[in-house]
């Protein structure tokens, strides 16, 4: 009957949610293990990247004349805080500048909200300040998407607007407009899959970030 169908659909939805969360956790732990040497490294890097896969996939050794320590992991801000920052996995965390980029994974989650994402990202900013008080923190805005059913640009714009006006203790770097095509979507000159950046995309990202550092 109707009640049984509703109960089944609710259970199915909950099981899917649990499976997604378990998959994210497994992926996070695998990447953290892979990056363990980078977390432990004693380095004179002037810039540290903390964020999801768009930062993690950026193959760059120097940015604006400073050595880069890339600690990007394809997870949410919440998991980054719980699995990496709070346990203080990052040793020798002395970079003068820290660049953050989070949010694109959050908007694929059921029930997400700009306020909740902002609170999670603010918690990361506050934790970075505790561990590296002299660091200047920069937060990169989300880039647009194209050809994706799991993300839409209305959500991206809404989140960018909220984060840029509510985060504190960080310098916001807007990226959205520079990556859009004439239709307001991610220009596919800069991406092969509609979310992640390709070589040309990273060239543009380097230019935009360097101008603000």
Language-model-derived ranges and their functions:
Residues 1-25:
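Conserved alpha/beta core of the MobA/IspD/sugar-nucleotide pyrophosphorylase nucleotidyltransferase superfamily
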Residues 23-30, 207-213:
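Conserved catalytic region of serine esterases and O-acyltransferases that act on ester linkages
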């Amino acid at each position: 009957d109707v009640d049984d169908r509703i109960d089944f659909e609710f259970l199915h939805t909950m099981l899917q949610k649990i499976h997604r969360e378990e998959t994210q956790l497994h992926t996070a732990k695998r990447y953290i293990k892979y990056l363990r040497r980078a977390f432990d490294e004693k380095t004179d890097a002037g810039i540290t990247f903390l964020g999801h896969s768009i930062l993690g996939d950026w193959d760059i050794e120097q940015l604006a004349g400073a050595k880069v320590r890339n600690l990007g992991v394809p997870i949410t801000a919440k998991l980054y805080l719980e699995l990496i920052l709070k346990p203080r996995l990052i040793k020798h965390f002395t970079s003068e500048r820290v660049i953050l980029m989070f949010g694109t994974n959050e908007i694929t989650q059921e029930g997400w909200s700009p306020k909740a994402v902002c609170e999670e990202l603010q918690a990361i900013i506050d934790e970075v300040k505790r561990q590296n008080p002299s660091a200047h923190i920069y937060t990169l805005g989300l880039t647009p998407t194209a050809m994706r059913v799991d993300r839409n640009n209305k959500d991206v714009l809404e989140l960018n607007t909220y984060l840029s006006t509510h985060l504190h203790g960080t310098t916001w770097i807007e990226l959205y407009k520079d990556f859009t095509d004439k239709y307001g979507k991610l220009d596919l000159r800069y991406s092969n899959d509609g979310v992640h950046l390709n070589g040309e995309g990273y060239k543009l990202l380097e230019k935009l970030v360097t101008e603000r550092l």
